[in-house]
């Protein structure tokens, strides 16, 4: 399902699929591989999955990848430039060229505030060197990227994260639960419906999302509902965009098309025809 991460298998590679957040109409990936691995034990509360992305385009033209945003923070290990990436709030494009291997940690939505120590919304749309947050990251980067196989990479990353787990924060569970409710319940199309399910006042919910999730409740709701629109369009239904917009909670088709274009970079009609 686009926009929703499939269950990763512990130390067994998950086949590259649209669920990785790459649009199906991206150009052919060439010598490209994306695999995911589930965290074990205590890390499962903090990490959605580990991922490994590699490509070898030496002698070939660069590849452009359209990537969908998710309400997650990533820690990406690249030799000499390991960085932390905040929640990206819009459609973005990556250019792949040469040969590279990246090992990443995708944190669960809502868990990164205790690591960061300031609102996750403050790092939206930006990245910064991981050394600013983890002083020993250079040694970890060297050990991890010099590992003989992915199993060892996961072991190194897991050991590092377990040594840096912050104290328990009760609000983390609430934030994770709110995002999970949005992701799993297609009837949540407006902030009001989320407020009723979470039993919170709007100001409290908005503050929690900025601090813990890194995006507003409205943004997260729209993103997950638009991911559902993508899935339906990929499967050839429904043909009636007005009905689709209404089912996703939009007052009119024009607003739906506008949001779709902001996220995908093209209109629903252009997406279907591509």
Give the residues covered by each predicted segment.
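DNA major-groove recognition helices of helix-turn-helix
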Residues: 205, 212, 229
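DNA major-groove recognition helix of helix-turn-helix
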Residues: 209, 221, 259-261, 272
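Contiguous, well-ordered alpha-helical segments that form the cores/surfaces of helical PPI scaffolds
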Residues: 227-231, 258
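Alpha-helical bundle regulatory/interaction domains
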Residues: 1-192, 197-202, 215-216, 231-235, ...
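A secondary-structure capping/hinge motif
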Residues: 212-215, 259-267
């Amino acid at each position: 399902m686009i926009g929703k991460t499939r269950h990763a298998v512990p130390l067994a590679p998950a086949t590259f699929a649209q669920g990785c957040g790459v649009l199906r109409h991206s150009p052919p990936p060439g010598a490209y591989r994306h695999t995911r691995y589930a965290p074990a034990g205590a890390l499962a509360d903090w990490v959605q999955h580990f991922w490994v992305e590699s490509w070898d385009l030496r002698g070939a033209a660069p590849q452009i990848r359209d990537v969908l945003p998710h309400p997650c923070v990533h820690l990406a290990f690249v030799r000499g430039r390991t960085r932390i990436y905040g929640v990206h709030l819009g459609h973005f494009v990556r250019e792949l060229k040469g040969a590279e291997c990246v090992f990443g940690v995708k944190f669960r939505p809502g868990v990164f505030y205790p690591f960061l120590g300031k609102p996750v919304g403050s790092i939206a749309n930006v990245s910064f060197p991981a050394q600013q947050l983890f002083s020993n990251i250079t040694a970890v980067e060297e050990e991890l990227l010099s590992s003989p196989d992915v199993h060892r990479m996961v072991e190194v990353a897991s050991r590092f994260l377990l040594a840096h787990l912050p104290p328990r924060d009760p609000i983390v569970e609430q934030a994770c639960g709110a995002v999970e409710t949005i992701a799993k319940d297609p009837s949540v199309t407006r902030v009001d419906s989320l407020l009723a399910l979470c039993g919170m006042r709007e100001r409290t919910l908005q503050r929690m999302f900025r601090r813990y999730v890194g995006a507003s409740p409205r943004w997260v709701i729209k993103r997950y509902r638009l991911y559902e629109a993508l899935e339906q369009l990929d499967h050839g239904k429904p043909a009636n965009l007005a009905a689709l917009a209404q089912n996703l909670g939009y007052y009119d088709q024009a607003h739906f098309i506008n949001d779709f274009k902001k996220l995908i970079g093209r209109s629903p009609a252009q997406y279907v025809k591509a």
